[in-house]
Design a protein with these regions (language model features):
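Flexible, Lys/Arg-rich cytosolic regulatory linkers and terminal tails that connect or flank
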Residues: 1-27
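C-terminal terminal-structure detector
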Residues: 2, 18-23, 110, 160-222
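A short, structured surface patch at a secondary-structure boundary
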Residues: 102-167, 208-215
């Protein structure tokens, strides 16, 4: 039986991949590779400082944290972050699901008890995402695109939601510069589809520049 939600999704913007020309995709990949390589080199000192702070704050866990995410066409890969939570945080998820602050197939808690002191700071300024430059270098991710979801989230996806998996996921995107965690899941999906349908080099550059401003003046990050 069709629900009101199904009808809203059917009437919403649908993905059109016609604008993703070979020229755009090749240019995007070349830029991603070059920018991520330069970023990893220039930010090596920042990586070292963050690694030391993470270890001093919580010496029992690792500096880096990898998590299985789903990329283009649902292909899985290991996404890297600086660890911002206590060791064994993944095992605590089931107990915290009822406290989810985000509507839809996504899990976020504003006052997540698993986050460490250093973790709270690096998450606020998105510094925990810096290791994803390695994912960009490998081609798992792009600098700009929809955020890669967890497998457990995709299980709950509708056919409409799955449209966000038709492109390479990104480190940043319209969601991050439009309110981030202040937006609910349906709004995030709508923004992702809008990005895919209007993707171009100029739009990617605009999103990257706005991301810098969001990092400097963080809102909706937790």
């Amino acid at each position: 039986m069709e629900t009101a939600s199904d009808r809203r999704q059917a009437q919403a913007e649908q993905v059109d991949l016609g604008g993703l020309t070979p020229t755009y995709l090749i240019t995007k990949r070349c830029f991603d590779f070059t920018a991520s390589l330069i970023g990893l080199v220039l930010l090596s000192g920042v990586f070292l400082v963050l690694a030391i702070l993470i270890k001093l704050d919580d010496p029992h866990g690792k500096v880096f944290y990898s998590q299985t995410r789903l990329g283009k066409d649902g292909r899985s890969f290991q996404m890297w972050k600086f660890r911002s939570m206590v060791a064994g945080a993944d095992k605590m998820v089931d107990k915290l699901l009822k406290k989810n602050d985000v509507e839809g197939a996504m899990f976020k808690i504003k006052n997540d008890p698993r986050i460490t002191r250093v973790g709270r700071v690096i998450r606020k300024y998105s510094l925990d995402e810096l290791p994803q430059l390695y994912n960009v270098l490998r081609g798992d991710m792009s600098l700009v695109g929809p955020r890669p979801p967890l497998p457990r989230e995709v299980i709950k996806y509708t056919n409409y939601d799955r449209q966000r998996l038709t492109v390479v996921p990104g480190v940043t995107g319209l969601w991050q510069i439009s309110g981030r965690n202040d937006l609910d899941f349906p709004e995030m999906v709508a923004l992702d589809i809008h990005y895919i349908n209007n993707a171009c080099v100029l739009e990617d550059i605009k999103i990257l520049l706005k991301t810098v401003l969001v990092v400097v003046r963080p809102t909706g990050a937790y």
